[in-house]
Amino acid sequence: MSEPAPEVPEELFREVKYYAVGDIDPQVIQLLKAGKAKEVSYNALASHIISEDGDNPEVGEAREVFDLPVVKPSWVTLSVQCGALLPVNGFSPESCQIFFGLTACLSQVSSEDRSALWALVTFHGGSCQLNLNKKCTHLIVPEPKGEKYERAVKRTSIKIVTPDWVLDCVSEKRRKDEAFYHPRLIIYEEEEEEEEEGDNEEQDSQNEGSTEKSSVASSAVASPAEQPCSPKPRAEVSKGELMFDDSSDSSPEKQERSLNWAPAEAPPLNTAQRRLPQGKGPGLINLCANVPPVPGDILPPDMRGNLMAPGQNLQNSERSEILGTWSPAVRTLRNITNNADIQQINRPSNVAHILQSLSAPTKSLEQQVARGQQGHPNASAVLFGQAKGAPETHVLQQHHPPQQPQQQHPALHLQPQIMQLQQQQQQQQQQQQQPQPYPQPPSHQFPQQVHQHQFSQQQLQFPQQPLHPQQQLHRPQQQLQPFQQQHALQQQLHQLQQQQLQHHQLAQLQQQQQQQHNLLQQQQQQQQLQRLQQQQQMQNQAAHLSQASQALQHQVLPQQPLQLSLQPPPQQQQQQQLFGHDPAVEIPEESFLLGCVFAIADYPEQMSDKQLLATWKRIIQAHGGTVDPTFTSRCTHLLCASQVSSMYTQALRERKRCVTAHWLNTVLKKKKLMPPHRALHFPVAFPPGGKPCSQHIISVTGFVDNDRDDLKLMAYLAGAKYTGYLCRSNTVLICKEPSGLKYEKAKEWRIPCVNAQWLGDILLGNFEALRQVQYSRYTAFNMPDPFVPTPHLVLGLLDAWRTPVKVTAELLMGVRLPPKLKPNEVANIQPSSKRARIEDLPPPTKKLTPELTPLVLFTGFEPVQVQQYIKKLYILGGEVAECTKKCTHLIASKVTRTVKFLTAISVVKHIVTPDWLEECFKRQTFIDEQNYILRDAEAEVLFSFSLEESLKRAHVSPLFKTKYFYITPGICPSLATMKAIVECAGGKVLAKQPSFRKLMEHKQNKSLSEIILISCENDLHLCREYFARGIDVHNAEFVLTGVLTQTLDYESYKFN
């Protein structure tokens, strides 16, 4: 930053169009301008949003609405230092990041581990430093010792954690409690090394300092592969960060997507190898640069000194040579290659190991062995503590049970890499041993070691060729002088430990390959096992339902395996066996509910409108059905919303047909009694008011008309929020086809895309589907009808439909078939409303001037009545208004909250009753309106207003004059309706969501118009930043009731 302008490469930011939010350092702006960046005045036009304040609403708008990258100013400065545009990942200023606000001091960790930890913390919003001062919030230290540790203990403001706290936080995507990661809680296992400790005390004390620097003191730090490098060399981290982001989520769906990223990481591996010194692969570099790490939780510090002391001087020259030629850029490339392993700790082992084997099959011993130690501490203790063949094999078998026989061809391409790695390690050992020939240890150890190599390789199916160079390596040493045996014993112990580490690594790689094949076979067999999985899921979830529903499930489920095994296509056969009425009996279309006796449950408690329930009864009776006030044995149908009730259990036990009001609506439309065939036709499997999807915000794409309405209702019944739009806050997108803009955006934003069957299964009791959005049955979009319920979930409900509804002869005789009409009679019978519309209106008897001509609208009347009024209006010389804004008179019989009424109240001169028009027609002239003003005492008491006073206020000044409104898109009534009401009242509706800065600017400057925010329950996720800033957001009643009463009520309708 001291010389910003000259340092900026020419046209570095030529493609950058930036929009700055908040106060940005002027030097950063100068860097951007020097690199030919362009500043835009509106965030939607920008390619990058630059801000230090991640909670600013403008930042949220850019991210949610325009999907723009938001970066901190440090992205600019580091891009200049690197001479290239850095990827935007890792530079987010948002406060939702795991380590936001954290300042960590790193102590007593190796340089590579420090780089990895530094990258993890800064990538997730924190900052790191090497000095312990007042700014520090955390001290990351592997062991409870050292000067920084002693000082941090005395400060309550500094939390002390081990490095694995960072890894676990990143793995679980949340900041975990630091108390469980204090270094004092580390437990060391010393049983395996007690004998060697006494022999090497003196040498351990000499190497203690170097041990702290070169070893990894915490097992979790060495567990994952190398993380992205320290912040400075970030120019080559783009692909690594992409993999990092993709693998940072532990959800099953994103684990599967990680497989797609893995092949893209192969080229960086080759690049890294090309840039290494000749003759040295990644494994060789790590062996020379660092002694293989020993986890702090397994071995005590003195034991680690023993393990690293032999041969240490031999490695110094090699290490300095390698470190001199191995640049940070090379390490960065290697870390990019290994990035797939970041945060794999808590994942299923098969997925994690597949990623590891695909992305970096030839990783260093340091990384691979350490990762194995994370999962198998006992095995590590045995491997490091003693050079025995049988115990090692036993431990491997214990922790890695035999896998099923798999195809061998994917493993073949890995074996040459393993052999190459072995040969490189053997060459290194030869280089170390030849300058100082030490005597051979006692002969009984070497045959034992050979046996170990052979047994392990046979067990793991690895080629035994690399064994021979090792045998040749040891034979010349057998002729050395006896006085060097003690020193050689230590050196040989070190070699054996490295060999054991090597074979442990090979075992890990082989296990990864086997697990990869297992996962692939599971995916291939998934479709064949779908029905069996569904049965098991149904049995598991039966335990979570209520007692009544549980009893039902136990009655239905025992028959499922037999039916599914005996009937391969159950859905087709069931469809053939289900009946409404007997096909042999002719039922009149108008009486298609003949023989059906309904009892109604659940709905009376849920419906506030009792008139609607009475309407149902009237409609059922009009089509030949009967409604009983209680459930009796003569009932044939139970109309219910939920499976969790005693009435439902009784009805199912008596083989009654249990259906919903939605089914009734469907058969009324089709005029035919038919079995239920959609998920909405069946009662839901949870109690009324239950909300299994309460955490979901659902959007749909590809569905129109009735199908879209059905999905809205299904989402409502499941307790989910529904949005007609798609934003990053949505949790699920329900697709008809895998195409369209919403689908593409959902894939880009990693929003699960499922079919409609997913939601139907949840309604019918398969709550496991909530965690199975990635299952193939829910991601298949070529289904003929995605609303058809899963057969095994409705077996018991369909059982009653296997016999037809009985219709007695008396019932049929009581129904008179309507006489067939002649064609000319059919033509003459037309609805009166249509007849009125096509008739020519009589010419007006009087011609009035435009100023005196009433422009009238009608609301709250039947169409036939409206046509009669229009005829009289035309005779008198009046006209029907083209739109509300031009209307002078609104004719209504009562106060109604229709669009016409709520828009007209702000602009019309008079709201009158139909009596005014009738009286005008009698007198054949328009008379004074004062005696015919609409008065509705009931509505005025209900809404606590006076219609006459409201009209007077509207005439004085429009209610929303000089006011701006931002209305969220999911508002009900629709956005178009709300906009019409607001604009008629003098307000204006903003098309774009206003930023916090704009809101405050309008609030503080009295000369600017006020901005009012209107939203609804389903859109509250769009207003999170407003709530965080204490800005009021109101519901639709602020507008609807406001225009009716012509008042502004800022308190009654705001969200808390």
Curated annotation (Swiss-Prot):
Entry's CDD domains? BRCT_PAXIP1_rpt1, BRCT_PAXIP1_rpt2, BRCT_PAXIP1_rpt3, BRCT_PAXIP1_rpt4, BRCT_PAXIP1_rpt5, BRCT_PAXIP1_rpt6
- Signal peptide residues on this chain, from the entry's feature table: none
User: Which cell locations does it reside in?
Assistant: Nucleus matrix; Chromosome
List all Acidic residues biased stretches.
188-205
Question: Which region ranges are annotated with the description Interaction with TP53BP1?
Answer: 577-1056
Q: Disruption effect?
A: Mice are developmentally retarded, disorganized, and embryonic lethal by 9.5 dpc. Mutant cells appear to replicate DNA but show reduced levels of mitosis and widespread cell death by 8.5 dpc. DNA damage appears to precede nuclear condensation at 7 dpc. Reduced levels of histone H3 methylated at 'Lys-4 in developing tissues.
Please give the InterPro entries that the UniProt record associates with this protein: BRCT_dom (IPR001357), BRCT_dom_sf (IPR036420), DDR_Transcriptional_Reg (IPR051579)
Q: Which GO terms describe its cellular component?
A: chromosome; histone methyltransferase complex; MLL3/4 complex; nuclear matrix; nucleoplasm; nucleus
Could you say which tissues express the protein in this record?
Expression detected in all tissues examined, including brain stem, cerebellum, cortex, heart, spleen, kidney, liver, thymus and lung.
Region annotated Disordered, chain positions: 188-276, 393-412, 419-486
State the UniProt keywords alphabetically: Chromosome, DNA damage, DNA recombination, DNA repair, Nucleus, Phosphoprotein, Repeat, Transcription, Transcription regulation
Q: Which positions fall inside the BRCT domain?
A: 8-93, 94-183, 588-681, 688-776, 853-934, 955-989
Identify residues that carry Phosphoserine.
223, 230
Please note every region of biased composition (Low complexity).
Answer: 214-223, 396-412, 419-435, 445-486
Protein's GO biological process:
adipose tissue development; chorion development; chromatin remodeling; DNA damage response; DNA damage response, signal transduction by p53 class mediator; DNA recombination; DNA repair; endothelial cell migration
Q: Where is this region: Interaction with PAGR1?
A: 94-183
Main localization of the protein described in the UniProt heading: nucleus
- Matching PROSITE patterns, A to Z? BRCT
Tell me where the sequence motif Nuclear localization signal sits in this chain: 655-672
Q: What is known of its domains?
A: The BRCT 1 and 2 domains mediate the interaction with PAGR1A. The BRCT 5 and 6 domains mediate the association with the MLL2/MLL3 complex. The BRCT 5 and 6 domains function as a single module and are necessary and sufficient for in vitro phospho-specific binding (substrates phosphorylated by the kinases ataxia telangiectasia-mutated (ATM), ataxia telangiectasia and RAD3-related (ATR) in response to gamma irradiation). In contrast, in vivo two pairs of BRCT domains (3-6) bind to phosphorylated TP53BP1 much more efficiently.
Physiological role: Involved in DNA damage response and in transcriptional regulation through histone methyltransferase (HMT) complexes such as the MLL2/MLL3 complex. Plays a role in early development. In DNA damage response is required for cell survival after ionizing radiation. In vitro shown to be involved in the homologous recombination mechanism for the repair of double-strand breaks (DSBs). Its localization to DNA damage foci requires Rnf8 and Ube2n.
Its subunit composition reads:
Interacts with the C-terminal transactivation domain of PAX2. Forms a constitutive complex with PAGR1 independently of the MLL2/MLL3 complex. Interacts with TP53BP1 (when phosphorylated at the N-terminus by ATM). Interacts with HLTF. Component of the KMT2 family MLL2/MLL3 complex (also named ASCOM complex), at least composed of the HMTs KMT2D and/or KMT2C, the common subunits ASH2L, RBBP5, WDR5 and DPY30, and the complex type-specific subunits PAXIP1/PTIP, PAGR1, NCOA6 and KDM6A; required for the association of PAGR1 with the MLL2/MLL3 complex.
Q: What name does this protein carry?
A: PAX-interacting protein 1
Whose protein is this, by species? Answer: Mus musculus (Mouse)
